[in-house]
Structure formats: structure tokens, C-alpha cells
């Protein structure tokens, strides 16, 4: 789905990408081949040569789900990642996400099925869903204290 939505900038998906030591497994990573905003800006500002996407098939996201995704982010994976979940998340999730932004400058962009459906519709109409994901980043960044 992310290849369809952002295939012009996200290349070479690796499913269940493992660290060399084999201790961590990431659901999907993409090479960030962007040369335009916002993906290029994120590559430079946050070091995302590879974009991490974690997927959770749960009713509600827990702190551990968010913490796990944030733990993958850092010097080697960059400081922006995506957590895809089935359901809409509430204000409690936004508060938890702000902890990662405030304390570690890690941005976990949470998307759900409805976001993805809306973005697919945009793409089908010939529009670019990049603005929608940039809005998620901006709201998280501006919501930080």
C-alpha cells in the first residue's frame, strides 16, 4: 500500500528487516529516494535514509506499541517512522507521542485504515497524498512542548 501511495520516493521495501545481530525485527523498511519535500527534508533533518513502518493489528494502541516503534528510531534509522494501526487513536496516543518528540525528538506518525483509504482515494483522483502525511508530521511537531 505504501508503495502505491509513495512509490515515487519510497523504494525497495524490505519486509521483516532484521538488525545484523538479529535481535530486532522491523515490519517494513523503505529506502528514502526523495529529492523533494517533505520526504527529502526529513531525510536531511531527521536522517531517514530508510523509513520504518511498523504495523499493529490491535483494537487500541498501547504505550508499548508506541515505545517499540520509537525504540527503533535513532541514529541509524532516523527519527521519523510510521506506525500503521487498524483503528483511530485518541488523545491519549497523541500525548504519548509528544513524550517521544519532547524527550528524544522522535516522530512516530500514526496512521489508521481510514487515513490509508482517504490517501488511496486522493491518489486515484491523481492527487498526491504527501501533503496529508506532512500534515501529520506538522501537527505532531507543533503539538510538542
Language model feature labels by segment:
Residues 1-145:
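Catalytic core segments in nucleotide and nucleic-acid processing enzymes
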